[in-house]
Amino acid sequence: MDVVSLDKPFMYFEEIDNELDYEPESANEVAKKLPYQGQLKLLLGELFFLSKLQRHGILDGATVVYIGSAPGTHIRYLRDHFYNLGVIIKWMLIDGRHHDPILNGLRDVTLVTRFVDEEYLRSIKKQLHPSKIILISDVRSKRGGNEPSTADLLSNYALQNVMISILNPVASSLKWRCPFPDQWIKDFYIPHGNKMLQPFAPSYSAEMRLLSIYTGENMRLTRVTKSDAVNYEKKMYYLNKIVRNKVVVNFDYPNQEYDYFHMYFMLRTVYCNKTFPTTKAKVLFLQQSIFRFLNIPTTSTEKVSHEPIQRKISSKNSMSKNRNSKRSVRSNK
């Protein structure tokens, strides 16, 4: 890996300051991957998002409606983290697939095994009234092959727009990956929001999270065009090909790889119920607790030693097979 000196990572898509033409040959590269990397990616992004809402006084007393949540192993960590901070949250986890048994038996967690449609969304809104709703969506439909088609993506994004319109959440975190320009069908609309980049995404993932906080006005929509798709592809390829393969030499941390640098800046914003002498100590504590929870071996993190014994994930099969499958260089995940 090449070295670089950086003041901060790219946290949002708009911050990426360069671009690179996509090279199909990159598909032949062997990707480095951590165990349970998909759950790690989701956990870090959602912990950052919910901590941001906590900082704004939005989180306490809310119901998190998570659509497309299975297997949801990482959600147990999120639930326990905020529960231990004394933040009152209810969780409604909805997916047509079954959830990890680690989520069973929790009074503040409701598990629903079904897919959503407009009628069911209206019933959720009626059931939860007058509670404030925080929406997290990780919907993903694939009608064939390993990757969702552009038609699949457009269907998912139309459904996410309906979720916002009906549930009227105070905040949302939506799945977002722009269709590739060579697979373009038509222009479409997504909610206006901040496009958060994700550490520990697969090597050439073009996916990000669309974060929004709503202040009472109608949902603002942004039109996405083929020209936008070209911009997304070039900037995300630059991020994945060049930036994420760097070692950050001025980053004082046991592992100086860019994704750990990115993770550091996310975890530094997270509240804890104990004090630490430095921000670095807090981030190390959080990272180690997350890696232990997800059973990610300490050998994957350089120079982190003296870890407590890791707990076992309830079942190796609790992780969706689709999340562990080999993906194309322009991965949706």
From Swiss-Prot:
Underlying gene: OPG102
Name of the protein in question: Cap-specific mRNA (nucleoside-2'-O-)-methyltransferase
Family affiliation: Belongs to the class I-like SAM-binding methyltransferase superfamily. Poxvirus/kinetoplastid 2'-O-MTase family.
Low complexity composition-biased segments: 311-322
Subcellular location: Virion
List of residues binding mRNA: 22, 177-180, 182, 205-207, 233
Highest taxon, organism lineage: Viruses
Keywords: Elongation factor, Methyltransferase, mRNA capping, mRNA processing, Protein biosynthesis, RNA-binding, S-adenosyl-L-methionine, Transcription, Transferase, Virion
Organism, scientific name: Vaccinia virus (strain Western Reserve) (VACV)
